[in-house]
Amino acid sequence: MRILLVATDVQVPGNHGGSTHVSELFAGLSKRADTLLLARHDSEGARVVPLGKPLRHHKKILRQLDSAALFPRAWREARSFRPDVIYERCSSYGLGALLSVAFDAPLLTMVLDERFSWLSLLRADKLVATRLDMIPRAVRAKGELVHWGANVERFAADLDYDAARAAAGFSADDFVIGYSGSFKRWHGLSALVEVAGRWRDPKVRFLMVGDGPCRPEIEATLGERGLVERFVFTGSLPYEEVPGRLVAADVCVAPFDPTEHAPSRERGSFVLDPLKVFEYLAQQKPAVTIHADNLLNIFRDGEHLRLYAPGDVDELLSCLRWVYDHGDEAAQMARRGRELVLAKYTWQAHADHLYRLFERMLAAS
């Protein structure tokens, strides 16, 4: 089987969630079949074709025209490959659908949010999403639920905890609350500032792995409240360096704010499969994140991780204090969380699921 993966707005390799998704999917599919990736213009790697540019238009029609303009080169690059099936990340805005028509190849489209072309949805033989209500009702019958995961070889449980803490400047008796990811408003990082302000113990420290547009605001607030010394910021890191830094944490948190995330706000609940939570658990870290329907379909509160009501800083603080006060129970919870991720929620498991879908699509074509 020859699989063409179309994700022309995503840089590979990169240091954000989209890059992680595409890189890990590409690696997983490549273990099963000959796979070619059409990626953003600044991408690199074997079997990776740098092609698309960041889509700067806000209107869908202009984004679709941008993607259509890539078709001649995309067709030339894919012609010698002769794909049997095509996977389109929805934010490629129809380029995968055009290639599907050109090569008469079955199309699978991934729907993440409202960034899609109806051409991709209508042309697709199959649609996949981490929540089926993300797929418009008119084409939802073609939908199949999928889950993302973690690279459990990279986010391993046996990385050097002591060395990472020493490198970050933490002492042996510090209790370190970790976060990894982007610093956007919907990631809810202001909640960690509030936690620091209410939990005044100087031995409670915060490890912030990543960067983003809200970082200056966060640092300014920390300065105003006299909390700067309790936070360590690593800045943006290559994906492969994140596990070696994050291992220094004693508990990891994903304090999302669904009210700042448009698709989640519209549906009244957080809609994404949060990669960072899978990664935290893969490293066997006690994890705390928000209560959301899709998370409850994967994890059990208190068995695999701790959940709190979105926006409730008091409840978040209570969950973190529980980890601090119940170290043995928290460690057992983290071990169960890791076992669940290893069994069901790895990137290779996701790629294998898609490969089975491709086999069904080819058999039906």
Residue ranges, per PLM feature:
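Carbohydrate-associated surface elements
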Residues: 133, 148-149
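Short His-centered aromatic/hydrophobic patch
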Residues: 88-93, 111
